[in-house]
Design a protein with these regions (language model features):
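ATP-binding N-terminal substructure of ATP-dependent carboxylate-amine bond-forming enzymes
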Residues: 1-103
Length: 103
């Protein structure tokens, strides 16, 4: 059974660029037969986005300018293991998460 794996990268840290390079490397090497990979980027200012764009944009630090970003947060409910995403219609959708890999 394929698991939903959330890779979280970026953040308000002096290690921001290291996180981006590491995330790109991890994403290039994950086994897609075992994982449905979902990426969540955090800008230097602390904004959280679901990212569906190209891995090179992560490594080149231009991912947040991409139209493939959608505001998102992790569910604050301990029992609800999901990513909450604001869709184009202004409604919230949940994406179930099995594993979180912070980079």
């Amino acid at each position: 059974m394929v698991k939903n794996l959330l890779v979280i990268f970026g953040g308000c840290s002096s290690e921001y660029s290291v996180s981006l390079r590491s995330a790109a490397s991890v994403l290039r090497n994950l086994d897609s037969s075992k994982y449905n990979v979902i990426t969540l980027g955090i800008t230097k200012d602390g904004a959280w986005y679901l990212y569906n764009g190209d891995i090179d944009s992560i490594e080149n630090d231009c991912w947040f300018n991409d139209e493939d970003t959608t505001p998102a947060i992790l569910s604050p409910d301990k029992k609800d293991k999901s990513l909450i995403v604001l869709n184009d219609m202004g409604a919230y959708e949940k994406i179930a998460i099995d594993v979180i890999f912070p980079v």
